Amino acid sequence: MLKIGRNATILKNNFWFASVRFQSGGFSEKLAKGPSFADFLNMDKPLTADEAFELDRKVELPNGSIHKRLPSWLKTKVPLGTNFNRIKHDLRGSHLHTVCEEAKCPNIGECWGGKDKSRATATIMLMGDTCTRGCRFCSVKTSRRPGPLDPNEPENTAEAIKQWNLGYIVLTSVDRDDLTDLGANHIAKTIQKIKEKAPHILVEALTPDFSGRMDLVEIVAKSGLDVFAHNVETVEELTPFVRDRRATYRQSLSVLKHVKKTCPHLITKTSIMLGLGETDAEILTTLKDLLEHNVDVVTFGQYMRPTKRHLKVQEYVHPKKFEYWKEVAEKLGFLYVASGPLVRSSYKAGEYFMENLIKKRSGNPASMSV
């Protein structure tokens, strides 16, 4: 008699998810009808008017209710302001990319346009604007072999950030599975350059999983950053359907745990999207898994479908539910929790609490303000 292992159990659960949560067909049918890798390679093609306004029309939610328009809590103002325009201009001049723009983040105006520029937050996307992976929630362009790295990017990034005089910067990157070191040294060099030119700026790096290679994780963890972020994105049960198949839930947890083992002083952070069909029990399990792997900070945000090629929204989670998960996470013991429909992993990363937490851990309480 064959012994059924953990992988077989997960496989069984995955097929159950495909047949029960997506009533229109099984997992194989979903993959066949869903976006192919080629679709992700051609994401520059503009949407039609009907596709662009799809979510402003009648949407049937899992509970049977109908939303005729996008919920009011998901609408944002057109980004304006001096800071917003200045940062955008500098980015173009330095040939830099931001995940704020590439991922169509709804908070770009709020993060870039703050009246107090020391509280403004920009998220620079390193290693180009094209990823080697094709996650089914992400709007960043995809290619098996993106262009070569810009050797001047670390210097240009550091110089631009120095000129902005921000208090907090977030660095993220595309996945570069085509590179020997998967981009780890490029990220680390950028962090080191920033700290050389502007040592007062707090640096958060939202990193890939580096295919689970802990030697590469260590290169970034030891580069001088203040916050090491890596997103699990969703609950374990949904991971195979949401993320690229090379990214696994357990691998992401291992990355976060290894960072804390390597650099105990570093703050570790992750993000979870809601609205993909996850259950409360699965979210609670995820939070407990994160704590067991020594994660300090967690954020919750609403999944928004960027194009018709991506996963459909299963639920528009009400703001009160986000408040509920914030309270649950805080009671469980996370040091900081940001939770709301429009929250993204780098959303308001430079809030007072986060900055004070970092300064306290670095032994600089005199510079703290409340």
Curated annotation (Swiss-Prot):
| CC terms in the record's Gene Ontology section | mitochondrion
Reactions it catalyzes:
[[Fe-S] cluster scaffold protein carrying a second [4Fe-4S](2+) cluster] + N(6)-octanoyl-L-lysyl-[protein] + 2 oxidized [2Fe-2S]-[ferredoxin] + 2 S-adenosyl-L-methionine + 4 H(+) = [[Fe-S] cluster scaffold protein] + N(6)-[(R)-dihydrolipoyl]-L-lysyl-[protein] + 4 Fe(3+) + 2 hydrogen sulfide + 2 5'-deoxyadenosine + 2 L-methionine + 2 reduced [2Fe-2S]-[ferredoxin]
Give residue ranges for domain Radical SAM core. Answer: 116-335
Further facts:
This protein may be expected to contain an N-terminal transit peptide but none has been predicted.
EC code: 2.8.1.8
PANTHER family linked to this entry: LIPOYL SYNTHASE (PTHR10949), LIPOYL SYNTHASE, MITOCHONDRIAL (PTHR10949:SF0)
Checking SMART domains in the record gives: Elp3
Q: A GO molecular-function term, please?
A: 4 iron, 4 sulfur cluster binding
Subcellular localization is given as: Mitochondrion
Primary location recorded for the protein, binned into one broad class: mitochondrion
Indicate what this protein is called per its UniProt record: Lipoyl synthase, mitochondrial
Would the keyword S-adenosyl-L-methionine be found if you checked this record's keyword annotation? yes
* Enzymatic class: transferase
The free-text note explaining how the cofactor binds reads:
Binds 2 [4Fe-4S] clusters per subunit. One cluster is coordinated with 3 cysteines and an exchangeable S-adenosyl-L-methionine.
Pfam families to which the protein is assigned, alphabetical: LIAS_N (PF16881), Radical_SAM (PF04055)
The UniProt keyword set, sorted, is: 4Fe-4S, Iron, Iron-sulfur, Metal-binding, Mitochondrion, S-adenosyl-L-methionine, Transferase
UniProt record similarity statement: Belongs to the radical SAM superfamily. Lipoyl synthase family.
Q: Which cofactors are reported in the record for this sequence?
A: [4Fe-4S] cluster
In what pathway does it function?
Protein modification; protein lipoylation via endogenous pathway; protein N(6)-(lipoyl)lysine from octanoyl-[acyl-carrier-protein]: step 2/2
